[in-house]
Amino acid sequence: MPNKRNLKDYGFLVLKGMGMGAADVVPGVSGGTIAFIVGIYEELIDSIKSINGTTLKQLFTGKIAAFWKGINANFLLSIVAGIGISIFSLAKIITYLLVYHPILVWSFFFGLVLASTWFVSKDIKQWNWKTILSFVVGGVIAFYITVATPAETPSNLLFIFLCGAIAICAMILPGISGSFILVLLGKYFYIMEAVKTFNVPVMLVFIAGAAIGITTFSRVLSFALRKFHDITIAVLAGFMLGSLNKVWPWKETIETYVDSHGMTKPLVEANIAPNQFVWEAVGLMILGFGIVYFLEKLSQKSTKA
């Protein structure tokens, strides 16, 4: 973890968190993918993992400074602030764009995810049968998740708690969208409505589930990255590649739902061949790919500095 950051650095961290939050609002795009793109993924996992019995004991015994430093709190607070700002400010905008300009939005994210798959794969030091197999397995798992059918589920607070715990684990996995997991659990639009209408009980229970889920799962992921780095990165890159099925821009609606305002919106969709806005879509794909390329080069330059 970097020892010293200035105010400008923390401002950039907030912006990176906003990128993660914007991605997490979209079913099919992972905040974990954005964390990988902007170069904060492993620090994020390690920082979350550091929230444990030892650091919590420091907090409750008044050793605030030790607790703050131990969990890399300045970093975490910046990221969480960015995610929160993005979710509450962009939720309405992104859901509007997905309804009225879906091809253009998905095209941009398709370029982002495709480029991310390539650049994350470059982090694998040695390709062999183990990493290739891990890459394929990750891709198959992600593809299967994208074609699964959404379930009919209850809306009680216990289930909302479980949804928070499960979705947050997906959110920190590149290529596995926490929002799409909520779609499969039948609760994406329910949670989005809770955010837009500021339904405090539902949001608090969901956040509590997310807090438990992320602190538990981050330990597993941190261990895997430390002990089996190449295999873990291969699985994560496979997740990204497999998720491209979900972010393919051209779709036809198979099943719809009616939201709380009486508007009919798509729930289950199938991919089709490009049939409209082709050049605009290609342009946005190139833009998405180019942004990742630029961020990768920027990251390499700052690492060498």
Model-identified regions with their sequence ranges:
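Multi-pass membrane proteins that catalyze or facilitate reactions on polyprenyl-/lipid-phosphate substrates
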Residues: 2-24, 30-305
